[in-house]
Amino acid sequence: MMDRRGFLKNATLVSAACLMDFREALALGAKDAEVGKAWKGWKKGQFQIHLIYTGVSESMFLIFPDGTTMLLDCGDHNAIGRGKLAVPVLPNPDRHAGEWISRYVLRVNPQKDYVDYMMLTHYHSDHGGNNKFYARKETRDGKDYYLSGFSQAAEYLTFGKAFDRCWPDYNDPLPLTQEAADAFEHMKDFYDYMLAHKKMEIEKFRLGETNQIAMRKDAAAYPGFSVRNICANGRIADKEGNIRDLYAERKKSNPVKFSENGMSLGVIFTY
């Protein structure tokens, strides 16, 4: 067993190695001739990942080699209300994150306002929005409906299908009533509305699969591209399909909640 001194020494070495890798990556990026130039758009055969930074939301927009598109996370939360920990809304606070994200997608999406897939990695407001911090509140289907995160983006974008970690019963591995109640109620209302009025499909994320998140336009042209579902709800799947539950021991004590971060969805893209 490693003692404290040995642990600290190894941790320092690992940190230094990571820092060197990061510096090397920055140096390589700075040498790239395309850095600083205007984006030239997407071309068939390219796999593009756009990291959308608004300061208050996690979000990525992906364009697969055949043009299939996916919005991964689209949140919003009251970052300014955190006082000294506040983060500025980018590019400016004139709009909420859901609108900023959708405006960006409209500019780079080869399908204009249509997005094939959307996926919420886990139920935290900075990933999906919530009912306490929103751009606008409306009455839809006889109840309050809040435009925040994904629900705000859906006012500008059309989503074909959603992948969710625990839809439709929201109880895998535990009911979503404790750790993520606000984000859960918000996303449930959003899903219900999209099913009823926008014909969006919803599927539970299937751990270990390699064909659930698939190219929809010309998959045969790119046999080397794949998306493998590797983690969900505290479980991980290896490439042989074996699944390991990282929370198996903790479940024996009958907990009422787990951290949503540990429940996150994860995929591996191969191209």
Residue ranges and their predicted role:
Residues 6-29:
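N-terminal export signals
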Residues 11, 64, 74, 165-166:
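Glycine-rich, histidine-containing beta strand-loop boundary motifs that form or position
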Residues 29-48, 54, 104, 112, ...:
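Flexible, acidic/histidine-containing loops and adjacent segments that form or flank the divalent-metal
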Residues 122-127:
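Histidine-centered divalent metal-coordination motifs
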Residues 17, 31-33, 100:
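Short, motif-level signal for alpha-helix interfacial/capping segments enriched in acidic residues
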Residues 19-20, 83, 132:
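Alpha-helical transmembrane segments and their juxtamembrane interfaces
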Residues 39-113, 261-271:
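Conserved beta-strand hairpin/beta-sheet module of binuclear metal-dependent hydrolase folds
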